[in-house]
């Protein structure tokens, strides 16, 4: 059976999708269960649960319901064994030891525990602390940084270039004697930019600074090796990799040992770092999702890349002046192709979303989608407010089909042309008027 990257996307027949993509029955079931009239293109916000993951979880809701911390009977032993199996499945995907995996409620909690926990531990001696991050991190990381600033920590927010990538030399210059932590995400949730983690980790190790990575958008999609990348803390989400919502994990390096102050008190579960009864069904789901990614990551990536290129090519060929936000670099990889962020000048992003009401799209992070403010990520790239307001994020995933790519390209092209026809500014630009020279009153 040919793999997705061996198929010319222009020749892919929709009716043959199942035979080209997977022979697995669960994949076919997942595709068949989706409503044809609605198309899901928001895989950065969340992913559907893979049928194989659901099958693994179900027994722990109904039959194997023991508390994994109850060690006096077989119900508890059974659940504990399932949790430890999942712990190893997660660890294997990032090249870690299973004892380095702490289960949490999701990447937001993992980020908070990593950042606040590490800084609080370092600050116990009363010395000043300095933390480095970037201007394009997820909101939960930026809010954690502001929390630390209110407590007296000094925080440096590094700028990024037009592709969303940090300057490694600037990172070196930013590290000072009181720097205790560098927190930089692996893949950006809005533009898909991939940061040079191995180089960042090397710098941090040389300067004896902890390196935390928010890998919510990277885990299970791109190769991660925490030892090769010298990552000390790594945040993981379950629902971004076709697992359940409400579960995640934090990798915490053991050698040399990374010390954290827990966020809250309780029974001392998870090595005393995260108290509370573990949700066995959700953890089993996270473990199974990680195991599936371990087997199919490269196949998924090849498939997603082929569909992403097809969509981008179709839109560029049929819509004038389409701007790609973020990098297109593939060697080394600086962009995850499942996250395609495009700007359509003279088209309001919110208006385009309304015009494409049968397609699940986003104009930015799901956590800030209720805000009408322009994306702070796009503004950090140097885009003005108008361009930032005209952006749409196309999310492509494991279950996306060529038929959906074709339909999304068709509907987007039609909607953009219709909205531009209603724009007097676009009409003026088409007539050769340089809008930047006009003095508006």
Curated annotation (Swiss-Prot):
TM regions (residue ranges): none
Similarity comment: family membership: Belongs to the class-V pyridoxal-phosphate-dependent aminotransferase family. NifS/IscS subfamily.
Gene this protein is translated from: NFS1
Obligatory cofactor(s): pyridoxal 5'-phosphate
Residue positions where N6-(pyridoxal phosphate)lysine is found in the record: 240
Residues noted as binding pyridoxal 5'-phosphate in the record, renumbered to the chain: 107-108, 189, 217, 237-239, 277
Purpose: Catalyzes the removal of elemental sulfur from cysteine to produce alanine. It supplies the inorganic sulfur for iron-sulfur (Fe-S) clusters in mitosomes.
Superkingdom as given in the UniProt entry: Eukaryota
HAMAP family assigned: Cys_desulf_IscS
Protein's cellular compartments: Mitosome
EC number of this enzyme: 2.8.1.7
One GO biological process term: mitochondrial tRNA thio-modification
Entry keywords, A to Z: Iron, Iron-sulfur, Metal-binding, Mitosome, Pyridoxal phosphate, Transferase
UniProt-annotated binding residues for [2Fe-2S] cluster: 367
Subunit structure: Interacts with ISD11.
Leading EC class: transferase
The organism's taxonomic lineage, starting at the top: Eukaryota, Fungi, Fungi incertae sedis, Microsporidia, Pleistophoridae
Protein name, per record: Cysteine desulfurase, mitosomal
Active site: 367
Catalytic activity entry: (sulfur carrier)-H + L-cysteine = (sulfur carrier)-SH + L-alanine
Keyword hit for rRNA-binding: no
A Pfam family matched in the record: Aminotran_5
Species annotation: Trachipleistophora hominis
GO-annotated cellular components: L-cysteine desulfurase complex; mitochondrion; mitosome; nucleus
